[in-house]
Amino acid sequence: MNKDTRIAMLTRLRDENPAPTTELNFSTPFELLIAVLLSAQATDVGVNKATDKLYPVANTPKAILALGLDGLKSYIKTIGLFNTKAQNTLKTCQMLIDLHDGEVPAQRAALEALPGVGRKTANVVLNTAFGLLKDDQGQYFIAVDTHIQRLANRTGYAKGKTVEQTEQNIIKNTPRKTEFFFNLHHWFILHGRYTCVARKPKCGSCIVEDLCDFKEKTS
């Protein structure tokens, strides 16, 4: 896929969805952070069902800590790996209180120091909660999950054997300081979740099918 084709692909995704956002429900950076922590190996729908009950009761580090381990588990027990996620959530809440006055930091190193937070989660928070294109070290970033990894490689937009390689090649291939760069994460996730799915991609209804390098297209 060449530069012009990539721009055409992003243009179509933009025209279909001019203002994309995460499907996780949140109203504060803290709510987003916890939702993303809970979303590993879980669906956004499943996470939302849990947080829609949790957040009216506890949506701050102090309030979640007050629930205790068993109390928190009672809200998130429908989510996969809920035991580990509950422990990480409580540890994260304590660190936010001890180190950041209960606020979510907008610095990569501080985010990635939180239990259960890796590069992807930090990138989602920096982009979606704080509206950033670059981190505090001045480096551009894109949050890459399994959907984006699959879509970028399958379409030919950006190749990479690992999510880190794919992220760097997406950054290289995407015009910066534009709505394309800021919104690509959400466009690719949504397109990968609903159209360019893993097993049987819906090529027949794909708005970028004619631009895509995938050779095993389905009807």
Give the residues covered by each predicted segment.
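Catalytic cores of DNA base-excision repair glycosylases
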Residues: 2-219
